[in-house]
Amino acid sequence: MKHLAIGALAARHALHARGEALARAAFYIAILLVLSRLWHALGAGSSYVWYVALTEWVTLAMPLISVEIEEDIRRGDIAYRIARPVSYLWTKVAEGFGSGLVRLMIIGGAGGVAAWILTGGPPPRGVLLSLPLATLAFFLLVLWQTAIGLSAFWIGDTQPFFWIWQKLLFMLGGLLFPLEIYPEWLQRVAYCTPFAPLLHGWARLAFDPDPALAAKTLLLLLGWGVALTAFLVWLYRRALAVMDVNGG
């Protein structure tokens, strides 16, 4: 319950300080304008514009938890934050998810209207089917960001890890292009990674609204979510051990 309250508080703060979300929304609309023209030039249908609208929506709403954790460690604030009775790890997750939900609503509202105008029609029914899965995928992205932030206990600067992870997400997750247009060997590689269900798995419902596909994506997200949560808990315990050894 404490972490639900923390997430709700972070959401209220994000709602009051919504300038950043509005700036991201403006950038999002600009991206949609460019990419919609690209897809139309390639002769693709409007459902592909909605696909990109979905993947970019979740990506642009991501909170930069890794930067926040890195700053806590660099400033030395981490010692007293960890000493609090509420878990630092799940506090950061709750804050990131709470503030991220506000960005999802603001950016999604603006982008949904823009995509509707650019495609000349309402979203395909698969878009509505994808929204619950998008929320679950977004939660997993928050967990990834937290794990990258914890790496600062060992490497100090998390930017190299974040850069590599981001590029893998963009390429193997199918940020700009559905995996179906990739070479077959690259498709097989992507489907073996956690990145494919994070973006492509649910966003492709925009042009393939198959309930069986949605169910498969749900199972993949849940499976990778369990594995990622276990890894995150293990990593956090190792980080606490590093603090104890260093006299933190």
Spell out what each predicted region is:
Residues 1-248:
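Hydrophobic transmembrane alpha-helices and immediately adjacent juxtamembrane helices
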